[in-house]
């Protein structure tokens, strides 16, 4: 090969100085703030990397072919300060009961859903700090490789065992937090915390869980979510008390107003669209003898000014003469009531005039009929 001539810039460069590469340690505070998948890579291996455990007695012996661990998801031990170790130990002791705290708490026949779990993180919600727990390397090294043909039988045994395990678990342990890689064949609705399950949910409410296993309540009436049960003791207004009686059942007492009721004071009133029962109509006879006390109209006895009577009879073209802005609001209300009284009196006079005219017409018709009958009788006597 032909050698390339060095340029003037390359000739003028100084000789490189070889140094030692030192890896920078990450601060413990920043390590806790970084997500786990950034620090350690993916935590869920592929199916070809980890095989299911054997059901034989020698399944967990360390001799024989050992599973080759995937270095992409198994973290290496990190040198920590004594303060960091004490803080993690305190977090581990304060962890909830449904998280596995040691390798002895993990069932060996639980299947592959926990065989590759290297990190279990507690839910970090509402500002609570999360704790992480790691299983020892012997847990991975003690699993033997199995042929691919036997995995179908192991999968069936896994789901069958999970079904029996979920049925034997007590109901007060809460929802299991693992669920990584596979979903159990049993509904997780039976693994809820029954501390507030004794209270029935109001109409339009339902229960659900977050991705980290925390229980919350959904109000479909207002499309809102709540962490606490809608009918819990903490949800009562001030001055209310929930009483559980063997004789009367559960009821709520309002110590402020000295009353009791069965309905929760904060329960939403949802209208029900049930068919109402048929009601037979029974007309009630109104008693006409009762004297109804009606307040008298103050304008009937008030003296109407002369100018207001002139204004009521005057045509509209003279309205600009009165300056209404000089009147007070109370006076205008009084004059408006007086004008209504004048119009009612005028209407009453008009009605009386038409009624007198109608009575005169009826009287004239009656007189003419009587005259015709009298003439007919006289004409019959003559013949």
UniProtKB/Swiss-Prot annotation:
Outcome (variant: residue 361 to A): Loss of interaction with STK3
GO biological process: cardiac muscle cell proliferation; epithelial cell proliferation; hair follicle development; hippo signaling; intestinal epithelial cell differentiation; keratinocyte apoptotic process; keratinocyte differentiation; lung epithelial cell differentiation
Effect of residue 346 to A: Loss of interaction with STK3
UniProt keyword list: Coiled coil, Cytoplasm, Nucleus, Phosphoprotein, Repeat
Matching SUPFAM superfamilies: WW domain
Mutagenesis / variant outcome for changing residue 365 to A: Loss of interaction with STK3
PROSITE patterns per the UniProt record, alphabetical: SARAH, WW_DOMAIN_2
Pfam family, one: WW
Residues bearing the modification Phosphoserine: 94, 136
Residues annotated with Phosphothreonine modification: 210
Organ and tissue specificity: Ubiquitously expressed in adult tissues with highest expression in the pancreas, aorta and interventricular septum and lowest expression in skeletal muscle. Expression was higher in fetal than in the adult heart. Expressed in various cell lines.
Keyword Repeat part of the UniProt annotation: yes
Chain ranges of the WW domain: 199-232, 234-267
Any coiled-coil regions, as ranges: 344-373
Post-translational events: Phosphorylated by STK3/MST2 and STK4/MST1. Phosphorylation is not required for SAV1 stability and may increase the number of protein binding sites on the scaffold molecule.
Subcellular location: Nucleus; Cytoplasm
GO cellular component: cytoplasm; cytosol; nucleus
Classification via SMART domains: WW
Keyword Ion transport in record: no
Domain SARAH: 321-368
UniProt-listed PANTHER family: PROTEIN SALVADOR HOMOLOG 1, SALVADOR FAMILY WW DOMAIN-CONTAINING PROTEIN 1
Function according to Swiss-Prot or TrEMBL: Regulator of STK3/MST2 and STK4/MST1 in the Hippo signaling pathway which plays a pivotal role in organ size control and tumor suppression by restricting proliferation and promoting apoptosis. The core of this pathway is composed of a kinase cascade wherein STK3/MST2 and STK4/MST1, in complex with its regulatory protein SAV1, phosphorylates and activates LATS1/2 in complex with its regulatory protein MOB1, which in turn phosphorylates and inactivates YAP1 oncoprotein and WWTR1/TAZ.
Subunit structure comment from the entry: Homodimer. Stabilized through interaction with STK3/MST2 or STK4/MST1. Interacts (via SARAH domain) with isoform 1 of NEK2. Interacts with ESR1 only in the presence of STK3/MST2. Interacts with WTIP and AJUBA.
Name of the protein described by the UniProt record: Protein salvador homolog 1
């Amino acid at each position: 090969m032909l050698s390339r001539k060095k340029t003037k810039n390359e000739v003028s460069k100084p000789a490189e100085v070889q140094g030692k590469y030192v890896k920078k340690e990450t601060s413990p505070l920043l390590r806790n703030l970084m997500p786990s998948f950034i620090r350690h890579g993916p935590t869920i291996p592929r199916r070809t990397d980890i095989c299911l455990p054997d059901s034989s007695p020698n399944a967990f012996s360390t001799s024989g072919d050992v599973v080759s661990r995937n270095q992409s998801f198994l973290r290496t031990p990190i040198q920590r300060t004594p303060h960091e170790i004490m803080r993690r130990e305190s977090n581990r002791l304060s962890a909830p009961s449904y998280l596995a705290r040691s390798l002895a708490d993990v069932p060996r026949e639980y299947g592959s859903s926990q065989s590759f779990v290297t990190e279990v993180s507690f839910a970090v919600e509402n500002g609570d700090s999360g704790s992480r727990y790691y299983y020892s390397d012997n847990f991975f090294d003690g699993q033997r490789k199995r042929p691919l043909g036997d995995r179908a039988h192991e999968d069936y045994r896994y789901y069958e065992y999970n079904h029996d395990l979920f049925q034997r678990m007590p109901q007060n342990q809460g929802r299991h937090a693992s669920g990584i890689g596979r979903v159990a064949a049993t509904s997780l609705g039976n693994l809820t915390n029954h501390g507030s399950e004794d209270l029935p949910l109001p109409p339009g409410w339902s229960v659900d869980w977050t991705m980290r296993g925390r229980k919350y309540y959904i109000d479909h009436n207002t499309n809102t979510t709540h962490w606490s049960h809608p009918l819990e003791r903490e949800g009562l207004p001030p001055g209310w008390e929930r009483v559980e009686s063997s004789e009367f059942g559960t009821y709520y007492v309002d110590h402020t107003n000295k009353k009791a009721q069965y309905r929760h004071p904060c329960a939403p009133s949802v209208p029900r669209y049930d068919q109402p029962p048929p009601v037979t109509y029974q007309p009630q006879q109104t008693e006409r003898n009762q004297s109804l006390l009606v307040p008298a109209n103050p304008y009937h006895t008030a003296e109407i000014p002369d100018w207001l009577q002139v204004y009521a009879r005057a045509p509209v073209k003279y309205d600009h003469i009165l300056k209404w802005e000089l009147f007070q609001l109370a006076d205008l209300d009084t004059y408006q009531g007086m004008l209504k009284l004048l119009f009612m009196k005028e209407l009453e006079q008009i009605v009386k005039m038409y009624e007198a005219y109608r009575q005169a017409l009826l009287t004239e018709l009656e007189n003419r009929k009587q005259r015709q009958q009298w003439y007919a009788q006289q004409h019959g006597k003559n013949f």
